[in-house]
Design a protein with these regions (language model features):
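Long, low-complexity, charge-biased intrinsically disordered regions
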Residues: 1-282
Length: 282
């Protein structure tokens, strides 16, 4: 039984933003309705009958599924397989770097799209191909055309003449509310420069599940907040088992983002091919 379904890497999304900014391409957003009902099962799957079919159930009869359903382990894999086959049939190539990335290149015209479960981001310098693809997908699947991209995976996207900014303002506010730190005093930095965390039991162990969930959510936030990436990387080294001082360090990060929740990652439109490199090592 195959249950694996690839997930798009978020750094691919950042490449999308940089590419479309500098080439002046549009970013289109589409959503697939009832995603997992579109998959074709590769194996035979049977389910028990509903209670209304009491007589048939007593006779030992069961239902054979013709399509995938929500709740089946195979559903994500089955859905993605069907979606990928549809794109291959329309002349799209699946990228080796990221299997959720598809592209079509013909006569200097390029169309690129990526998919995350039921969300599709599409960009192109070929309006005709872009609209044709939308029509083809809408014929095969129930689709909702959301127009220009504004939000994707809780990442807010804003575009201007100067470039594209991505942020997670609502995500930050929800995280602060969840941790009851919406009213906390903001910190000036995510971590003190001389912070040295230890694994020695000094303040007692913390709730491992809560600590790991918080760090996981902060890791996701770091995709648009590179300024807190180092601090998050450091506290993520103490997942087994977390201690009191480790949770205090996490709270310090939360206090920092309380005062900076409006920050965003900006992709500026640039001219030329000058490459700038920054490093903190030789």
């Amino acid at each position: 039984m195959k249950i694996f379904a690839p997930i798009v890497k978020l750094n691919i999304g950042r490449v999308f933003f940089s590419l479309t900014t500098n080439l002046d391409w549009t970013l289109q957003h589409m959503n697939v309705k009832n995603t997992f009902l579109n998959g074709n099962l590769e194996e035979e799957v049977y389910i028990n009958l509903l209670l209304i079919f009491d007589k048939e159930s007593k006779d030992g009869k069961v239902c054979k599924l013709r399509k995938s359903l929500y709740g089946l382990k195979q559903s994500p894999h089955a859905w993605f397989n069907r979606f990928a086959k549809s794109l291959h049939y329309q002349g799209y190539t699946q990228a080796n770097l990221d299997h959720m990335l598809f592209y079509k290149h013909k006569n200097e015209k390029v169309t690129i799209l990526t998919v995350y479960v039921d969300d599709i981001i599409l960009t192109s310098n070929d309006k005709g191909e872009r609209e044709r693809l939308k029509e083809k997908l809408a014929l095969e699947f129930k689709m909702k055309d959301l127009g220009s991209l504004h939000i994707f995976l809780e990442i807010e996207v804003a575009r201007s003449r100067e470039g594209i900014s991505i942020s997670q303002r609502k995500y930050v506010l929800d995280l602060l509310k969840e941790t009851s730190m919406i009213g906390c005093k903001p910190a000036n930095t995510p971590m003190d420069p001389n912070t040295k965390l230890s694994t020695k039991l000094a303040q007692g162990p913390m709730n491992k599940g809560r600590y790991n969930r918080l760090v996981g959510k902060l890791i996701y936030l770091s995709h648009t907040r590179s300024d807190i990436a180092f601090a998050i990387s450091y506290v993520s080294q103490f997942m087994h088992p977390p201690l009191g001082e480790h949770m205090e360090a996490v709270h310090k990060i939360l206090r920092d983002i309380k005062g900076t929740f409006g920050r965003s990652l900006f992709f500026r439109k640039t001219m030329g091919n000058n490459i700038e490199v920054y490093t903190n090592a030789d």
